[in-house]
Amino acid sequence: MSDGSCIVVNYDDATMPADGIVTIAKTVNIDGTDYTVSGILGSENWTAEDSYYDNGKTSYDRAAFANCKTIKGLRFADGSGVTWIGDHAFRFCSNLKTIENIPSELNDIQSWCFEGTALESVDLSNTNVTIMKDGVFYNNTSLTSIQLPNKLENFWDNAFYGCTALNNIVMPSTVVGIYNNVFEGCTSLSNVTFNDSYTTLGHHVFKKCPLAAVTFPNTLNSIGEYAFESTNLNTVDLSNTQITSLPNGSFYNCEQLSDVKLPKALTYIGDHAFYKSPITSITFPPTLQKIDAWAFQNAHFKNVVIPTQCSLIEQGAFSDNANLTTVFVNGLECYLAYKAFWSCPKLTDIYITSNKEPVAGRYGFPFDNNPKVHVMMDFVGIFSELKTSENYNPCNTTHFDSDFSLTLGKEWTTFTSAYNLDFSGYEDLTAYTAKYNEANDAVALTPVKKVAAHTGLILKGVKGETYTLPILDSNEDGLDAVTDNQLVDCVDAVWSSNSNEDYFLSGGKFVKSINAGWALPGKSFLYISSGRVNQSESPLRVYVDNTATAINGITNNPVVKDEAYYNLQGVKVQRPQHGVFIHNGKKVVLK
């Protein structure tokens, strides 16, 4: 070439070294002139003037060493200036086991270059390669390890497809994209160390890899279809990613997967996304709009809460959930398609919220075992008019009512609902609103009876007791006026930060949020917009403001059992001297 370089274009079996090790020289002398070897020919590097070297070869076989069965090793001379290796250059060199002394100048290994070789270990760490191109190590079934280029940015399609012996991958910090089928069929790949900056995972990228764990960084914005099909993942945390859509089959048939945290901004879950993945619980973000067909078939949920913005649950989305007992449909207009909750033998209660009269048939035959359907009182008649036709019962149930069943797991718990509810029918169950009092750095509770939907509450009742509360009309009069309530309602899940503003009820006191995460639907938490006065890390005490003075409120509150002293107005006293005080929930006299 005019620049003083040359390329390797072919080989001669007759001159192949006895040991099968081919050395790519730094320079070659042609007609008395030294030329620097800069590349190894690929099938697509041919031009019209290259016909001299064609020798009747066609297609991929024109690549330099394609289909060479006698080459066993490749070695680059010291100081080699090879910067590129062409496509298919060593394709089907089925006895090629080693590559040694790879030059640091190498910046381009083209597509399908080492397809079907017998390479066992490759070190590209010191090269300048930025892309693992299409099929570059496709079906290298003997490849057990590879040290990737330190400057690598992208994996193109099928780069390591079918490398069945590959067991470990460490991603350089520069990688941003891992595209389609890159590690599909790598049936020994159990460990991948990811960086914290990649953005894209393509279709089928880890399909049928025995991966047990994956770290998903906050830079990740897309996952392709069937990306993790049939992997061994047991937990998936996507909560901090930028993903808005989980496509079809994303985590299809992940038989060990029990715990999933979805992205905060997720709007769509594709069909078969978690098919046959035995997830035990899941929290849907409030942004979710659609769950497609068979998305959670064969999951192990006990209850499901469909968020308010979700308008469509497609066919079979939650079918064959053997443990599912309760479903809350918070969507104002949520269509439940055919067999949406089919073959859920323990499903007994469906709560449907709507601010509009339901269209007959909207909830047509999504269930199959006669569950109870609970709706607002003014909608009971409309739902009950959905008659059985000759072929099916549109709701597949004969029971519609306006009752809300509530079982307390603890004596004190937080609660919220998408319904207007009446708590006045029980002596041993009380609902409270809450307000933070800066003066004494405590939380005051105020009892309420008839409560509007979307009101954060604290409940006190009998642990393990089940209460049946009337669901009131959507326009019910006489609801208790609630002012200054600082409990955030979580009809849908609410993302809570680990700040000094969010507090959760624990052991009868409010404790500061430790880690960011979802506040679960059906619960509530205390939000102090300006934070606590003293920025204390200690739990916030609670007193019941149900009498004229704070004395009886504190006295009657078994939750307050700390070692502090309070005066008769409920204010904490740092060094009590003489007089009457409240201590550990009781009146004491100091003399």
Which residues make up each language-model segment?
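GGW-centered surface loops in extracellular recognition modules
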Residues: 1-16, 386-388, 392-435
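A short, polar beta-strand/turn micro-motif
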Residues: 395-425, 447-551
